[in-house]
């Protein structure tokens, strides 16, 4: 059966003590299981032994109680997992002591400590983390898709590069290459024609590593992944190989970039997490939203403006993040477009993945900040049929295509624009802090980088 696994059992007062005792003995009798401790997590209906010492003596195991029998002692569970270096936490409780929300919170705590969380018909295992990087590193991950994680990653890469840390980005995406692909954004000129040429070769030239290379002008390594688990693992990915390649590149710092809510299975020193204020609150404060938030050294909240999120909701998100992860720096932001080329005086057709409700703000910003005339806009960059419809509607009014480098930006938007004789300029999205009281986002990013470098040096 292999090595013996150390197990902590969670029990409640809704079961009679003899039933609990027999169940723990059944587990403890298994050759590969050693029940090292028990945590009482609540319930009083059938609780016959209230004294922790007596409970421990009768059970023959150390038993830990929280201060309030009506509340699950999450901190006690966490401390016990750490104290006993537990491999498995077995949940022998049931409703009404626990419900789905409470179990997900227990799972988030247990899994972050590297233990398995298991019950009668479920089993959650910790994230896969290959310890392969030979350079200081951070992860940039998100709590969902289309919340601006890649924009944050590209921006962070520029900030890190500007401060002379010589970074490279290892990005994984659903359209990434079969073998990890190096893009020397620091050396080659990435033009619309170049990207279209790559697309004609079968490359997904709007993949995240191309966006990072274009926007940040640094080395990137593109990888692929398929499937995303509840916790963040992927079904299959070649990003471990991508990380190993990054070890050999001419860079001194590695940024591992997630994909949607999926997390690269590579161990890093520190982590930045993006949370979309526009996401349903249940996806932030329930399921494994708290797990991802709990990983962060810096949380960047994106989409912090009406109509995507009310001021009240933004405050609610911020408050929850600080409750889950009080040590993390939290910065609320909005995105604003930044063309990487000159658009002044041009009649612009603007293609974006931004939600339709905020497009008007982006258009006004582009026109006032960069002196262009936006004659048409499509928010359907990730919907090819609707994108083609919008391009057909506006293409004859424009002399320049301004597009984010995402989804169908190359194989549809760029191709249609070039065929129509339009210039093509790509557009970055810059996170802007909503209030200076939150501090400087560049400083916050560099603080995480320096913590990562210190960790790397101290653990060599």
From Swiss-Prot:
Optimum pH is 5.0-7.5. It is found in: Cytoplasm. It catalyses: (2R)-2,3-bisphosphoglycerate + ATP + H(+) = cyclic (2R)-2,3-bisphosphoglycerate + ADP + phosphate. GO terms for cellular component: cytoplasm. GO terms for biological process: gluconeogenesis. InterPro entries: Cyc_diphosphoglycerate_synth. GO terms for molecular function: ATP binding; cyclic 2,3-diphosphoglycerate synthetase activity; ligase activity. Keywords: ATP-binding, Cytoplasm, Ligase, Nucleotide-binding. Its EC number is 6.5.1.9. It is an enzyme of class 6 (ligase). It comes from the Archaea. Homodimer. Catalyzes the formation of cyclic 2,3-diphosphoglycerate (cDPG) by formation of an intramolecular phosphoanhydride bond at the expense of ATP. It is also able to catalyze the hydrolysis of cDPG but with significant slower rates (8-10 times). May be involved in thermoadaptation. Belongs to the cyclic 2,3-diphosphoglycerate synthetase family. This is Cyclic 2,3-diphosphoglycerate synthetase. It comes from Methanothermus fervidus (strain ATCC 43054 / DSM 2088 / JCM 10308 / V24 S).
């Amino acid at each position: 059966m292999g090595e013996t696994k150390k197990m902590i059992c969670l029990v409640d007062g809704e079961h009679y003590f003899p039933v609990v005792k027999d169940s723990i003995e059944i587990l403890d009798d298994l050759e590969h299981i050693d029940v090292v401790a028990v945590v009482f997590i609540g319930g009083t209906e059938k609780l016959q032994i209230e004294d922790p010492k007596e409970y421990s003596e009768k059970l023959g195991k150390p038993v830990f109680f929280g201060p309030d029998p009506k509340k699950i002692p999450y901190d006690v569970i966490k401390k016990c997992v750490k104290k006993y270096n537990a491999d498995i936490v077995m949940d022998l409780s049931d409703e009404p002591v626990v419900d789905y929300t409470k179990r997900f919170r227990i799972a988030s705590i247990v899994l972050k400590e590297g233990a398995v969380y298991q019950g009668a018909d479920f089993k959650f295992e910790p994230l896969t983390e290959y310890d392969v990087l030979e350079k200081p590193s951070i992860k940039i991950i998100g709590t969902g898709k289309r919340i601006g994680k890649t924009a944050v990653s590209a921006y962070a890469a520029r900030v890190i590069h500007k401060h002379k840390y010589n970074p490279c980005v290892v990005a994984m995406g659903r359209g990434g290459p079969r073998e990890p692909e190096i893009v020397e954004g620091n050396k080659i000129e990435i033009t619309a024609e170049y990207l279209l040429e790559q697309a004609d070769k079968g490359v997904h030239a709007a993949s995240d590593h191309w966006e990072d290379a274009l926007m940040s002008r640094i080395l990137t390594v593109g990888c692929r992944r398929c499937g995303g688990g509840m916790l963040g693992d992927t079904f299959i990915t070649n990003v471990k190989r991508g990380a190993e390649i990054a070890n050999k590149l001419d860079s001194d710092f590695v940024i591992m970039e997630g994909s949607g809510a999926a997390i690269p299975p590579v161990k890093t020193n520190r982590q930045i997490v993006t949370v979309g204020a526009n996401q349903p609150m249940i996806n932030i404060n329930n399921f494994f939203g708290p797990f991802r938030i709990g990983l962060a050294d810096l949380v960047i909240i994106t989409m912090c403006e009406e109509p995507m999120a009310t001021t009240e909701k933004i405050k609610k998100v911020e408050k929850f993040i600080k409750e889950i992860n009080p040590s993390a720096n939290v910065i609320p932001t909005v995105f604003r477009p930044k063309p990487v080329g000159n658009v002044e005086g041009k009649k612009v057709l603007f293609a974006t993945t931004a939600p339709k409700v905020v497009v008007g703000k982006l258009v006004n910003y582009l026109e006032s900040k960069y002196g262009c005339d936006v004659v048409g806009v499509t928010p359907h960059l990730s919907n090819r049929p609707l994108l083609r419809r919008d391009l057909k509607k506006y293409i004859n009014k424009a002399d320049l295509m301004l597009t984010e480098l995402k989804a169908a930006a190359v194989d549809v938007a760029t191709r249609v624009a070039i065929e129509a004789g339009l210039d093509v300029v790509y557009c970055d999205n810059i996170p802007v802090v909503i209030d200076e009281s939150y501090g400087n986002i560049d400083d916050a990013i560099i603080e995480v980088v320096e913590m990562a470098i210190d960790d790397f040096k101290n653990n060599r």
